[in-house]
């Protein structure tokens, strides 16, 4: 009953409270309450609202850097967004993760990916189940070496290491994410099992044939070309090694001449710091072009609906106005000088993208979990 009432009255209540006048009292109360609650002992060790930073970007530069980010994008023949200068793709990705890393941990958790919500499992547990499948796909055993391509703050790598016994090395272009990954390693007791490294995954600082296996989880979508990152993975894998990846791609239902489809995809591109969106077929071909043998190509989002779809939690955030609350909290904290002055723009960018992300999933024109499993020939 409570949920039903909230679903009926919640959005309207949020609308009325989040007017210019109503926002003042709401923001003040929420911030004060949040400060009190998050100072209580036993709270989870993730960034709190007033702990949010801009990664490696100085507070006074946030607005300027965001404006540069905005100007990085141009439009193609059908109005589709893309990064105009491909030489700046990695700079863009690094800037994006400076902006959003703390916010992601605060609002979503330390697993920067999507997963289906499984029956009886929490959001975090469902995320870890999604991660642990990688160990099975790659046939990992204790003592093997594995590469996490685009590791973020490292939760997938830690999960794979913990459930397989393999030693996982992660690579991310963002130095601030390395700091967070090392912190989580100490917190979880996985120092030595997950080793985060800063670097460009299209030009990795690893010797050829260094790893028994490799995986990427919602990460290679940041590469200028998939062949660039797949080629590097091919180089550092030992012959016979497996590479599994969850790819962000357009599905067979995406129509580049459909203006609504393009608008949804543009929002996903801009709100996630992507250079563009590839199709599932382009992802398959990219792996084969660099020498891999394609073993599996399957969109996990189309699996039998045992649980909730991958966009279930974002859909709830939209439905119950949680994104509006987050935007109001951040805007209020900025106006009070508690957060970088222009960081509300970053929050709005991500929050405004979420409804389009949900629509992309619900209409099956986009998936963040097209599974590809490749093998390097012996």
From Swiss-Prot:
UniProt KW Membrane keyword: yes
A single GO molecular function term of this UniProt record: S-adenosylmethionine-dependent methyltransferase activity
Family membership noted in the UniProt record: Belongs to the class I-like SAM-binding methyltransferase superfamily. Erg6/SMT family.
Gene assigned in the entry: TMT-2
EC number: 2.1.1.262
Top EC class for this record: transferase
Record's bilayer topology term: Single-pass membrane protein
GO biological process assignments: methylation; steroid biosynthetic process
Function: Converts squalene to mono- and dimethyl derivatives, but not to tri- and tetramethylated products. Unable to methylate cycloartenol, zymosterol or lanosterol. Produces mainly monomethylated squalene and only 20% of dimethylated squalene.
Regions that span the bilayer: 17-37
Compartments reported by the entry: Microsome membrane
A GO cellular component annotation in the UniProt record: endoplasmic reticulum
Keyword Acetylation carried by entry: no
Keywords of the record: Endoplasmic reticulum, Lipid biosynthesis, Lipid metabolism, Membrane, Methyltransferase, Microsome, S-adenosyl-L-methionine, Transferase, Transmembrane, Transmembrane helix
Pfam families noted in UniProt: Methyltransf_11, Sterol_MT_C
The protein's name in its UniProt record: Squalene methyltransferase 2
Catalytic activities: squalene + 2 S-adenosyl-L-methionine = 3,22-dimethyl-1,2,23,24-tetradehydro-2,3,22,23-tetrahydrosqualene + 2 S-adenosyl-L-homocysteine + 2 H(+)
Origin: domain of life: Eukaryota
